[in-house]
């Protein structure tokens, strides 16, 4: 393969850059870019079947060569720059037979060290405060691949999952408020969904507080999500694409908006997007027709204010260029102080009003909810079992203790034990976590009524479900 030859010499390529001064700031930033001869859709670990590399270039510098920073690797991807822009995390694969692992190098490509040493594929790393990293771990290949978000020390020690249910969780980026931005399926179901989408979620670095950030459109998927300076989230949103199609349109969620909005035209195909400077982002855009076997992704600037594409920043006739990130310092994200109690094996969950549901007429479920049945998801095959039932008060409130780190979902029962509404997504609580919800798929734009729930007036302790001596859990 061509990467064997690349490993024998320092690779410098003359490239074509934009010379349009209107597109470029006074000091164009350096970029880290992933280049690949072939980009494949599908499983995260199989995106680059012929290999890939990370190069550094000066955006907007005409005819300046690029420098290969990952010589000796069959494939490298997912560059993530440290807040001081001195170091870079990336996913690397020394040979085609080895799994992806997380590596770190200096910004110029020297001083490489391996962070993770897993038997599974580890990709999409991001820097966390206080010498930690987060990444996506993929435990299998093909259509049934399962992925979870992991956190580890910067040397790879104390690696542990922070997501526990189905959904194919993938790390997208770290928000300035200290939460991790994830993408995963919606709903978070272990059963195939014909109209399933991939949506954005937020989670704390200790795995608590998982919440849907925005629900995606039916059949859509999100990739390459990152935060802009004004707090907007920008990402690539694809519709009903085929199994061999890659990319989609640019979309964003602005602060205070309830829904995402497409900001590019149908027919344009983008593979990645990342903040550049001011109102500009750097995008990877397909430059040839989608049905062309020689289609490539090239780098362009895109103005989010005018919603117009700028001139090409970089073009290589041999490789697609994508996942471009600016090699620039940025503010350090806030550190989240965990309040979990890892000596406990349970978590608590309170629902304020199970009647609240944005899917029901008038926003409220009809009928009388008498109890809630709790189901747990266990084992590699995803078998579910009933953990128990608990009472629901007349105001729709209930309060539970459940085993920690166990995916659970709920079924609302009437006075005869008939299911009124069944939750599709699996959720969990971390050890010692107190987790609350406003209702049953309630409207996120509305706050709960300012009242003390009846369940807390009648019971000062939660109802235990699935708690027994065999699992060692105690309320």
Question: Which residues fall in each region the model found?
Answer:
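Accessible peptide chain termini
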Residues: 1-2, 207
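Low-complexity, Pro/Thr/Ser/Gly/Ala-rich linker/spacer regions in secreted
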Residues: 473-475
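Sequence signature of WD/YWTD-type beta-propeller architectures
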Residues: 16-395, 401-407, 419-439, 444-456, ...
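Bacterial N-terminal signal peptides
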Residues: 2-11
